Design a protein with these regions (language model features):
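Metal/cofactor-centered catalytic core regions of large enzymes
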Residues: 270, 315-319
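Hard-cation-handling environments
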Residues: 304
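Metal-cofactor-binding active-site regions of metalloenzymes
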Residues: 2-289, 341-343, 347-352, 356-359, ...
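Short, basic/hydrophobic alpha-helical segments
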Residues: 332-338
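Short glycine/proline- and charge-enriched loop/turn segments
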Residues: 308-316
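Divalent-cation-assisted or electrostatically stabilized phosphate/pyrophosphate-binding catalytic cores
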Residues: 323-329
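C-terminal amphipathic alpha-helical interaction region
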Residues: 293-295
Length: 471
């Protein structure tokens, strides 16, 4: 029996161990998509206790605590931090097979030097150990980032954001990790929502362009894209129910936009036409600006209405949406391709059943650069051992896995960089099994190049960041 989470955790073959320990383990971290707060990086926040850093905004953990019958008081309510930590600790032993069990223990080992395991009985010991460690100068937000080997972070930012914290970080020569904005214009696209008109008023104010029709909306968006680009942005992200394709004339889209600006009801057909036009417009701009377009789709959000009213979005009440017409995605990419306006694109589906369709679709639109159209890393509900293996295996079956840009945290926590380690171990185990089974030769030069590439170097080249590859 192997020891729990030893140095060869998740590595079962000699080749897997060689690939991980010689090539993947020491690679830096490029976190090209996350939800951390740049203000906390600039201000170099120091956390008072482990609950603040672990449970403050982690809806993955909240969801499992609720599943374990924990009262909301000890999840997001007014329970004390110590009580919330106890509730989480008592939940942990039941999470066998869940990536949270692995991630949490990796974080305890890497950042706090704790080699035991967390449960209700050890909670006091872990609480005291972690809280004492958090008072050390190396355990501030910047310290955690630096000791994690991070070279660059892309946050997630709205077009109306000032980007002041990114600017302050860039001007601070005491911190050499790049923290760049990423453009997330969902609020400008959600014409069917009651928040649309007030948001467009904000966009008008920030851009200095009064948005009254489709032409002025495009001008305002271009204005803000240029502002983001001037502040280092070269990455966008979109959260879609699915990748739709409902083409319409400019006149139709203009009329729909004007209805939205008046707060009038928008039909489903009108919503899809507006969103299609919006996505086609911004995608063409991304191609001109050499930005990468990320699309996350397949999520049905905020399913528990009264808790959404109480807590807001991203609080643990989302699920997989199994409606994703792949033909429309292909049609959307085809229109961009037909005019030479297809940007580098990364597609992520929350539904694991979409792996094969994505892998097959992206093969239709490649060109210019290696892996121009990517299948994104296993995301959210798929961000576990089996999900990662299935995503990479399907991409290998139907595409060119060696060009894959690899892992991202997609996290709100500064301890989540261990997810890159988790991913790399699974990657090396997968490659190792293929070599051990005689399905790929023990060509160490090729294997080293691919492992280093998927761990870090491919993303450096793909996104065009000002970073050096690691050989």
């Amino acid at each position: 029996m192997k020891q729990f989470m030893d140095k060869d955790f998740l590595l079962s073959t000699d080749m897997a161990k060689t690939l991980y320990h010689q090539y993947a383990e020491t690679m830096p971290v490029l976190d090209y998509h996350c939800h951390i707060n740049p203000q906390e990086i600039y201000e170099d926040r120091k956390f008072d206790n482990i609950t603040q850093v672990w449970l403050g905004s982690d809806h993955y953990k909240w969801r499992q605590m609720r599943t374990n019958g924990v009262d909301e008081k000890y999840v997001t309510g007014d329970g004390s931090d110590r009580e919330k930590f106890q509730a989480w600790a008592e939940t942990m032993p039941k999470l066998i097979g869940n990536p949270l069990y692995h991630w949490s223990h990796l974080e305890l080992r890497r950042y706090f030097g704790y080699d035991g395991y967390l449960n209700g009985d050890t909670a006091e010991e872990v609480w005291n150990l972690c809280n004492a460690k958090l008072q050390e100068d190396s355990m501030t937000v910047r310290g955690l980032i630096k000791q994690s080997g991070v070279t660059l972070i892309c946050t997630t930012d709205d077009p109306v954001d000032t980007l002041e914290w990114h600017q302050k970080i860039a001007a601070d020569d005491t911190f050499d990790v790049q923290v760049l904005p990423a453009w997330r214009p969902d609020k400008a696209m959600n014409v069917e929502k009651p928040t649309f008109a007030p948001y467009i008023a904000q966009l008008s104010q920030v851009s200095g362009i009064a948005v009254t029709d489709l032409a002025s909306l495009k001008d305002a968006l271009k204005n803000r894209m240029e502002y983001f680009a001037a502040n280092g942005c070269s990455v966008s992200d979109h959260a879609l129910e699915y990748v739709m394709y409902a083409p319409a004339s400019d006149e139709e889209v203009d009329a729909i936009l004007k209805k939205g600006l008046k707060g009038e009801a928008i039909s489903k057909e009108e919503e899809l036409k507006y969103k299609t036009a919006f996505m086609l417009f911004v995608a063409k701009q991304y191609a001109k600006m050499n930005w990468v377009m990320q699309i996350h789709y397949g999520c049905k959000r905020d399913n528990k209405a009264y808790m959404f009213e109480k807590l807001g979005a991203d609080t643990g009440y989302d699920c997989i949406n199994n409606y994703a017409p792949s033909a429309q995605m292909a049609d959307f990419l085809n229109e961009l391709s037909a005019t030479g306006d297809i940007p580098k694109t990364i597609l992520y589906s929350l539904n694991p059943n979409d792996n094969a369709s994505i892998a097959s679709i992206i093969g239709c639109f490649q060109g210019d650069v290696p892996g121009k159209i990517q299948q994104g890393s296993a995301w959210w509900f798929n961000d576990h051992k089996l999900g990662m293996i299935e995503q990479m295996s399907e991409l290998a079956n139907l595409g060119c896995l060696g060009n894959f840009v690899g892992m991202l945290t997609d996290s709100r926590s500064f301890l989540s960089y261990t997810r890159h380690e988790y991913f790399r171990r699974i990657l090396c185990e997968l490659f190792g099994s293929w070599v051990e089974n005689g399905e790929y030769p023990a060509d160490m030069k090729a294997l080293e190049s691919m492992v280093r590439g998927i761990s870090y170097n491919n993303a450096v080249k793909y996104f065009g960041f000002k970073l050096d590859e690691v050989k």
